[in-house]
């Protein structure tokens, strides 16, 4: 963090049943917790080691009967400020999810969701593909059903919709110039409670595939875009800093918008 001038960051969980994530994660994550690849206990551990560096997030699976009770307790005991990252094989307008989202709205927690479409892996076991969220339409229904809740879209199935083409359900990282009229753009203009998380290969790819459009996009939605990483390198900063954006715009994306959603 110090190397890349990051003073503070949101620290997110990934709670997910064992049959809903790719076993290849065993190669890069110590899966010692029954609740998923990035359990809340691990985030608490890092927060306790450096409380000034982290804003604590937690996203219990809303299908669990005790999910809201667990989140409420985490807010009261550990000071959780963000509900994220939600990355599950469920439709995000599932009634249990909507109930959780509305609770987050009441508590002032922004909700971060990951979307992936069905890309065939060439395998049958344990799953032929790894879809999450049910696509952009299910996410839009959730946003519309919970107007008092702030949502942050994230992941390949979200960022592919920056362009109005047919690549979103064919490849995780679409290429080529952005075609005007993308679903993501329409939704950002229509729903004031929708924000976007620039992290990961998907967020970076959405910008780098068309740098000219990226500059226009970042300026238009400068009040609702949040810098994130998901990477150990500095690719996101390097690209953002190369676009000639004003310091005012960069300050909002790097820190201002996050502080607006989760004030210190």
What are these regions (language model features)?
Residues 1-8, 13, 72-73, 220-226, ...:
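Mid-to-C-terminal alpha-helical segments outside catalytic/metal-binding sites
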Residues 1-34:
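An N-terminally biased module of ancient metal coordination in phosphate/nucleic-acid-related enzymes
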Residues 2, 15-18, 61-64, 88-91, ...:
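Short, solvent-exposed loop/turn segments at secondary-structure junctions
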Residues 22-131:
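Active-site gating/metal-coordination segments in enzymes
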Residues 42, 138, 183, 213, ...:
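Hydrophobic alpha-helical segments typical of transmembrane helices
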Residues 46-49, 186-188, 217-218, 243-244:
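Short, conserved catalytic or adaptor-binding loops enriched in Gly and charged residues
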Residues 50-51, 77, 146, 191, ...:
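Acidic-histidine catalytic/liganding microenvironments
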Residues 81-82, 94-226:
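Catalytic pocket-lining loop regions of alpha/beta-barrel enzymes
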